[in-house]
Curated annotation (Swiss-Prot):
Plant non-specific lipid-transfer proteins transfer phospholipids as well as galactolipids across membranes. May play a role in wax or cutin deposition in the cell walls of expanding epidermal cells and certain secretory tissues. InterPro entries: Bifun_inhib/LTP/seed_sf, Bifunc_inhib/LTP/seed_store, Plant_nsLTP. Disulfide bonds join 29-76, 39-53, 54-100, 74-114. Belongs to the plant LTP family. Keywords: Disulfide bond, Lipid-binding, Signal, Transport. This is Non-specific lipid-transfer protein A. SUPFAM superfamilies: Bifunctional inhibitor/lipid-transfer protein/seed storage 2S albumin. Residues 1-25 form the signal peptide. GO terms for biological process: lipid transport. Pfam families: Tryp_alpha_amyl (PF00234). One of its GO terms (molecular function) is lipid binding.
Amino acid sequence: MAGVMKLACLVLACMIVAGPITANRALTCGTVNSNVAPCIGYITQGGTLPGACCTGVSKLNSMARTTPDRQQACRCLETAARALGPNLNAGRAAGIPKACGVSVPFPISTNTNCNNVK
């Protein structure tokens, strides 16, 4: 019985330690990209800003609660913006948060210093 209790305590301790580590890795570039995917047509071609874009930006902003999450989101957005290359309209990309009424703590750009994002 004492062996079972020791094992249970060890498992519980591992869960407590691993829980925050797993939570910190919840925001991936896949998650970021899927939320901003509805914005790509607007960024590259213009037109009307889709409601789904604003929904995605708002959802992403609410998921990025911690500094590491916001820095990760920044890096993912920076990489995605670079991938668009010459098709990127930087002004449209940077204006999305304001147009959607979302306060984002960093500009959507290819040259944001994501390490400074808090």
